Amino acid sequence: MKYEIDKKRLVIRVVPEREEDLYFIYLLIDKGDIIRGWTVREYKPDGVKEGERIKMYLAIKAEALEYHKFRGSLRVRGPVIEVQEGVEGVKGRRHTFDISIGREIEIEKNEDKPLEVVDEILNMAKNVMPRILLISIDDEEAAFAYITSIGVNVLHVVRNDAERSRGDSLLHDYLVTIGKIAEDLKRRLNPDKVVVTGPHIVVEQIGNYVRGDRVAQSVGGLAGIYEFMRAGLYDGLKTEMGIKAYERLMQLLATERNLVAIGLEEVEMAVAAGRVEILLIVDSYIKEDPHRAWDLIYKVYATRGKIYIIREDLEIGTSLKAMGGVASILRW
């Protein structure tokens, strides 16, 4: 993601470069922020019978956000408060900004907040892990998943339903099908890396049909996707997604309860004392109570703590949500 921050004007200019960037922009936009940029909307000047859709530069005051994780869609709705010169009758009406890849927008924050932490969060987008197309396969089932720093999306599950009596052609036809699906997904998703995982024998055989890194594990199919994520075979991915920090939190919760804070009240007390080493916060909580959530994030950043924003739809996000949406590992 390309971005610039004007700390005096509280303005952030961003250009999303990949779908994951839209998620981080979604996190940064709060209700009341002003969003500026080029957009297309219907315009009907006075005296004209029929309007037409034209490109114009305008600003809205954000009232609602709609983000779809793997659809690559981020929309911001609100009333128009500024419009380019020469365009009449648009100001005051409602408009929806479709924030898309490659298009610059400007976000003006509605409160005087320290923008250093905004810079830190935007850096998360710049340092995202490679996008992985994971093919988890055994002789009965193949599952395809798209893994990015913002989550795991299971795309397809294919059963090997060929007749067992067909012998050697059974596996060949199955692997040909898997290879065709893999090529289609590679063209559509343009992943940075393809990883094939499953029992060693099948992984070696699929290598003739799909090019990619091979990782042997005990099971394939849908169960193999979850084993891959749990096993730490790509430790860097687990670190970026906050999984390792969560695992450490749970270990300390069982062995040294005094070194963790669970829930908003405990975490706020720990933050006030400067004790927080790592903060884990669920993304949905940031939208539910943005004032308190950002206050925590800013204070942890100011005391050089590490911040992980966890997606609620991840397994660890569901667990953190049950803890109150926020937890932390303490320095002492």
Swiss-Prot record:
Keywords for this protein: Cytoplasm, Endonuclease, Hydrolase, Metal-binding, Nuclease
Main location: cytoplasm
EC number of the protein: 3.1.-.-
Cellular compartment(s): Cytoplasm
Domain notes: The N-terminal domain has the RNA-binding Sm fold. It harbors the endoribonuclease activity.
Subunit: Monomer.
Cofactor(s) needed: a divalent metal cation
Any GO BP: nonfunctional rRNA decay
Job of this protein: May function in recognizing stalled ribosomes, interact with stem-loop structures in stalled mRNA molecules, and effect endonucleolytic cleavage of the mRNA. May play a role in the release non-functional ribosomes and degradation of damaged mRNAs. Has endoribonuclease activity.
Family, per entry: Belongs to the eukaryotic release factor 1 family. Pelota subfamily.
Organism of origin: Pyrobaculum aerophilum (strain ATCC 51768 / DSM 7523 / JCM 9630 / CIP 104966 / NBRC 100827 / IM2)
Annotated GO MF terms: endonuclease activity; metal ion binding
Protein name listed in UniProt: Protein pelota homolog
GO cellular component: cytoplasm
SMART domains: eRF1_1
